[in-house]
């Protein structure tokens, strides 16, 4: 599927599912550089979408736009994002936070919080002023920690954690927010392959059981082919291809995007294409 076509791949594969996030004709610039060009996408409930593409292709910028994040350096000259049919720019930030949980690519705290306190911050959209958090909020936070297999860290301070443990804490915070849309930008940077696998399986499980819409950027394209229900391949701010693995994960598309010669083989268990540079 080329960039000239509307990116309606999710409608094709999940036509009976409800659309909850729509991107229409987005054009965006950093100064004179066109970083997003004619972006049209629809995301549904109960879907798992992986964004792939080389460095600088616009993946992180697109996720920020999807979540309604204000970036004074980014000039959106055309297009809109609709959250459940409402222009996201007209929705209060706290209300957006009840619908979309966003984990950026790098996030550091300047204070040495307890792990449980960091995860509890996911409950902020539901807090009622000076009354703070409830017992239910604490239970939700501890459940999120348990799902990420780090409940044993809840009374540790974040400055004591390894990079991988800290990353798991941030993922738990996103789960604690209990939104229907989960947007994750390179969430596994510091995690070993075993923990990446477990967390990807957890996300797939939550999609199936809670009808979540997960949108995630991955540098490891083979992971995207294994776990992604839908793929979006970006290059230089343009959608090069969208669709299922069979549609997107082709020699022509990947070599065009990454400007590298790839060899292909089939995964022996998942029966999806995998690549290696050569």
Question: How would you describe each model-predicted region?
Answer:
Residues 75-86:
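Conserved ABC transporter NBD signature motif
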Residues 182-186:
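Catalytic Walker B motif of ABC-type/P-loop ATPase nucleotide-binding domains
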Residues 21, 36-38:
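Conserved structural motif at the start of ABC-family nucleotide-binding domains
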Residues 120, 135-153, 178:
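Conserved ABC ATPase "signature" region
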Residues 67:
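Helix-to-loop junction immediately C-terminal to a conserved catalytic motif
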Residues 132, 157-161, 165:
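Conserved ABC ATPase signature
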Residues 52-54:
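The feature captures the beta-strand-to-loop junction immediately N-terminal to the Walker
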């Amino acid at each position: 599927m080329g960039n000239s076509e509307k990116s309606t791949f999710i409608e094709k594969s999940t036509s009976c599912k409800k659309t909850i996030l729509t991107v229409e004709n987005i054009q965006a610039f950093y100064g004179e550089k066109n970083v997003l060009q004619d972006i049209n996408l629809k995301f549904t409930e109960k879907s798992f979408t992986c964004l792939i593409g080389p460095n600088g292709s616009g993946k992180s910028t697109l996720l920020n736009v999807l979540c309604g994040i204000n970036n004074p350096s980014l000039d959106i000259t055309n297009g809109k994002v609709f959250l459940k049919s409402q222009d996201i720019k007209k929705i209060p930030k706290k209300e957006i936070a009840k619908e979309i949980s966003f984990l950026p690519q790098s996030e550091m705290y300047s204070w040495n919080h307890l792990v449980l306190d960091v995860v509890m911050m996911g409950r902020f959209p539901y807090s009622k002023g000076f009354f703070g958090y409830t017992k239910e909020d604490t239970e939700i936070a501890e459940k999120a920690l348990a799902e990420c297999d780090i409940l044993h860290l809840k009374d540790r301070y974040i400055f004591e954690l390894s990079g991988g443990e800290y990353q798991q804490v941030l993922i738990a915070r996103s789960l604690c927010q209990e939104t229907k849309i989960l947007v994750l930008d390179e969430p596994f940077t510091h995690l070993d392959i075993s923990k990446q696998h477990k967390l990807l399986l957890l996300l797939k499980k939550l999609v199936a059981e809670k009808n979540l819409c997960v949108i995630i950027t991955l540098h490891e394209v083979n992971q995207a082919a294994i776990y992604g229900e839908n793929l979006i391949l970006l290059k230089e701010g343009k959608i090069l291809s969208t669709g299922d693995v069979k549609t997107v994960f082709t020699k022509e598309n990947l070599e065009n995007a990454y400007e590298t010669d790839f060899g292909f083989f089939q995964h022996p268990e998942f029966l999806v294409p995998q690549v290696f540079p050569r």
